[in-house]
């Protein structure tokens, strides 16, 4: 491609609304252009990167035995009403009416239309398993779209849906998709981790997220430094301590006056307590109106997902109000504790390992010290109810846990019959009986992974693409292209030779100043730069620069082909 034949729309201005580096660079490099909040035009060079990602996704999905199709982007309300998602989806669902006043929506996801197609065409177990995928534009009316294509209202996604007769078959395909997603991200060239994830409202036994590691990631993931264990913060757990090893204290429980001390931080600062010897007591109310006291170490945080999964608690739970707490404890938040607690106590394992605890006395302006489990509190239950922290022992007892930020670019689920059952997508099984098909679903954020790649690899000058998705592998940057015949001839000849070899190349024939060409090449992220000028040509040389390493060298043109090989 010649630069004059495409649209290079770089700008020096830093958009005010762009916070993330990926958003800033995608706008500055002219890869996207904002049309409305959370809606972007894909400019030619940005689209080229997007298409390279799509090609990798297609290649690996096809290798895995999946077949591509394309579902409508506008969906009739009747389909989503069958699964009750027409109302459940809420304001993120963009609803519209046609001229006949019939209700439609712009597809935020495509479970219902794929099941509708399947129930009309798949009748027997003999047609299964079947894995179908599409690469489709979707729309979710986010209340606050931000971060560019990372959290846009309109986005491009690969979604696949598999159909099965039994759980074993479903699990086999799930594992195949797990492997396929790893292959996709390996081929793109990203540093990532597959992590176990909460199945949420979808249910089922298996769910994995694919997280690209980046400081700008909104998700917190944890992994073991001694094994392949990895999970997101919602699901991550730790090796349970042996409670029998807890030290037995002979110190006497003591009540101390603590006026105006309502937080753990103030307690530790003013009275010089070790925060790891304190506990937090938080009161919740479950869906049936039952109250519980949740107890964690003072430096830990509650995990909402784990709490909602406890057998004792009817989800969803809410935090008890100040009035509710006072009516039960005759004390206010900040003074609550575990001695003579009037509601059922559920304590985290780490809280159970503390001896000589400092906690609220269930009396305003007072705390207890030297509180010990078993002696001072005899009625309690134990559960994992907190977020893991760096240094926790991995649940497989191999290594310790570390935390990092990630950008979720893929998510796979075993749906089972969550959609097929309410939509009557049945088949005749091997036993001759009718039953719902089992399903898996596998989402991959095609446009999001592009932003994730930038977050993971950039410098102060611009984007450093993994070479497999760089818009152009080689940029020819001729100085005085329109003035020097020798420069023009050399540049044109090299351009044709690279095209013949199948190398993705762009020739900057705009006649721009050298500084502009170099800055644009760095900003957009062309992988290899070849600078052609009269001075070096007189010696039979050109300047070569590797965008990733910033290494420059003066080489003969024939050596360039060795570098690119």
Swiss-Prot record:
Subcellular localization(s) per the UniProt record: Cytoplasm
GO molecular function, one term: proline-tRNA ligase activity
Pfam entry (one): tRNA_edit
InterPro entries: aa-tRNA-synt_IIb, aa-tRNA-synth_II, aa-tRNA-synth_II/BPL/LPL, Anticodon-bd, Anticodon-bd_dom_sf, Pro-tRNA-ligase_IIa, Pro-tRNA-synth_IIa_bac-type, Pro-tRNA-Synthase_IIa_type1
Chief localisation class: cytoplasm
A GO CC term attached to the entry: cytosol
Example GO biological process: prolyl-tRNA aminoacylation
Enzyme class: ligase
Reaction(s) catalysed by this chain's protein: tRNA(Pro) + L-proline + ATP = L-prolyl-tRNA(Pro) + AMP + diphosphate
Entry keywords, A to Z: Aminoacyl-tRNA synthetase, ATP-binding, Cytoplasm, Ligase, Nucleotide-binding, Protein biosynthesis
EC assignment: 6.1.1.15
Domain comment in the entry: Consists of three domains: the N-terminal catalytic domain, the editing domain and the C-terminal anticodon-binding domain.
Subunit structure: Homodimer.
Function: Catalyzes the attachment of proline to tRNA(Pro) in a two-step reaction: proline is first activated by ATP to form Pro-AMP and then transferred to the acceptor end of tRNA(Pro). As ProRS can inadvertently accommodate and process non-cognate amino acids such as alanine and cysteine, to avoid such errors it has two additional distinct editing activities against alanine. One activity is designated as 'pretransfer' editing and involves the tRNA(Pro)-independent hydrolysis of activated Ala-AMP.
Family note: Belongs to the class-II aminoacyl-tRNA synthetase family. ProS type 1 subfamily.
Name of protein: Proline--tRNA ligase
């Amino acid at each position: 491609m010649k630069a004059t034949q495409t649209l290079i729309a770089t700008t020096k201005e830093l958009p005010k609304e762009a916070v993330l580096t990926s958003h800033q660079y995608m706008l500055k490099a002219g890869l996207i252009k904002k049309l409305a909040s959370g809606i972007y035009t894909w400019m030619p060079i940005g689209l080229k990167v997007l298409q390279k990602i799509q090609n990798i996704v297609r290649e690996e999905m096809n290798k895995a035995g999946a077949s591509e199709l394309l579902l409508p982007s506008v969906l009739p309300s009747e389909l989503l009403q069958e699964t009750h998602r027409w109302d459940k989806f809420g304001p993120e669902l963009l609803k519209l009416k046609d001229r006949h006043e019939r209700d439609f929506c712009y597809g935020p996801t495509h479970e219902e239309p794929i099941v509708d197609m399947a129930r009309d065409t798949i009748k027997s177990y003999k047609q299964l398993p079947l894995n179908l995928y599409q690469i489709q534009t979707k729309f979710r009316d986010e209340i606050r779209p931000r971060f560019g294509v990372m959290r846009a209202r309109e986005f491009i996604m690969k979604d696949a849906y598999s159909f099965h007769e039994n759980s074993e078959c479903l699990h086999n395909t799930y594992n195949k998709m797990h492997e396929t997603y790893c292959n996709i991200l390996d081929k793109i060239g990203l540093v990532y981790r597959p992590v176990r994830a909460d199945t949420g409202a979808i249910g089922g036994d298996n769910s994995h997220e694919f997280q690209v590691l980046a400081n700008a990631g909104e998700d917190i993931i944890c992994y073991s430094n001694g094994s392949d264990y990895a999970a997101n913060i919602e699901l991550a757990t730790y090796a349970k301590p042996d409670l029998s090893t807890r030290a037995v204290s002979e110190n006497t429980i003591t009540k101390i006056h603590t006026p105006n001390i309502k937080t753990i931080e103030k307690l530790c600062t003013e009275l010089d307590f070790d925060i790891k010897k304190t506990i937090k007591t938080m009161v919740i109310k479950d869906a049936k109106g039952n109250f519980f006291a949740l107890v964690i170490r003072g430096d830990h945080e509650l995990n909402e997902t784990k709490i909602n999964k406890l057998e004792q608690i009817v989800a969803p739970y809410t935090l008890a109000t100040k009035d509710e707490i006072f009516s039960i404890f005759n004390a206010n938040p900040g003074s609550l504790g575990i001695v003579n607690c009037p509601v059922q106590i559920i304590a985290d394992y780490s809280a159970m390992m503390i001896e000589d605890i400092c906690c609220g006395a269930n009396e305003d302006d007072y705390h207890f010290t030297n509180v010990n489990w078993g002696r001072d509190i005899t009625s309690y239950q134990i559960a994992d109810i907190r977020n893991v922290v760096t240094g926790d022992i991995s649940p497989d007892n191999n290594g310790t846990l570390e935390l990092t930020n990630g950008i979720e670019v893929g998510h796979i689920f075993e749906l089972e019959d969550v959609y097929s059952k309410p939509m009557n997508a049945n088949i005749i099984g091997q036993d001759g009986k009718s039953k719902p098909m089992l399903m898996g679903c596998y989402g991959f954020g095609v446009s999001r992974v592009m932003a994730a790649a930038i977050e993971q690899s950039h410098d102060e000058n611009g984007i450093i693409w993994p070479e497999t998705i760089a818009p152009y592998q080689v940029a020819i940057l001729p100085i005085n292209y329109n003035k020097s015949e020798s420069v023009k001839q050399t540049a044109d000849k090299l351009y044709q030779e690279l095209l013949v070899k199948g190398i993705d190349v762009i020739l900057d024939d705009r006649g721009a100043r050298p500084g502009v060409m170099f800055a644009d090449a760095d900003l957009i992220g062309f992988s290899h730069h070849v600078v052609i000028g009269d001075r070096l040509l007189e010696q039979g040389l050109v300047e070569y620069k590797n965008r990733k390493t910033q290494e420059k060298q003066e080489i003969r043109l024939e050596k360039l082909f060795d570098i690119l090989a």
